[in-house]
A protein has these predicted regions:
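Flexible "cap/lid" loop of the alpha/beta hydrolase fold
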Residues: 97, 105-129
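Gly/Ala-rich beta-loop-alpha elbow adjacent to hydrolase catalytic centers
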Residues: 83-92
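Active-site signature of alpha/beta-hydrolase-fold catalytic machinery across serine-
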Residues: 29, 94-98
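Conserved catalytic-core motifs of eukaryotic protein kinase domains, centered on the activation segment
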Residues: 27-28, 52-56, 117-120
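Conserved HGGG/HGGXW glycine-rich cap/lid loop of the alpha/beta-hydrolase fold
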Residues: 7-51
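A generic structural motif
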Residues: 36-41, 77, 102-103
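A short loop-to-beta-strand scaffold at the N-terminal edge of the catalytic core in hydrolase folds
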Residues: 1-6
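Active-site loop/oxyanion-hole signature of alpha/beta-hydrolase fold enzymes
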Residues: 42-80
Length: 129
């Protein structure tokens, strides 16, 4: 995980985690460039994405831990907004397990937490033959 920060002196802080096959740069182009200088933006590139493309992605928990450790090192444990899309939403969900981090608002976009879907498993097994 590599972190990009924008507007480090702003008092309002937001963490925006990109979806799979995107990057921090994608979030910046679509969102943060329209916010001006009033929000301190933390934009992580998850492993195997963007600036961290050479790193191996292992799990959402490991990415969340790396983001957590970075935020704590920067003394930023309270954020006004946490946003995660797709894979980024799963990582954000893992971040909520850290009791020393707090968010005023969290927003999950296109995140599925459903595991072992019986119909999907049946269909995948059927198509495999």
């Amino acid at each position: 995980m590599k972190m990009i920060e924008r507007n480090k002196t702003a008092e309002t802080a937001a963490l925006l985690i990109h979806p799979m096959l995107s990057s921090a740069e994608g979030i910046e182009l679509c969102v943060t460039r329209f916010w001006g200088d009033s929000v301190h933006c933390f934009l992580p590139d998850l492993s195997s994405h963007g600036a961290a493309a050479g790193e191996t992605y292992h799990s959402a928990w490991e990415e969340a831990k790396a983001i957590h450790d970075y935020l704590v090192e920067q003394n930023c444990t309270h954020l006004q907004l946490g946003f995660g899309a797709s894979l980024g939403g799963v990582v954000l969900f893992e971040l909520l397990k850290f009791e020393d981090l707090s968010f005023d608002h969290v927003f999950f976009e296109g995140v599925s937490f459903y595991e072992r879907a019986p119909l999907l498993c049946f269909m995948l097994n059927w198509w495999a033959f």
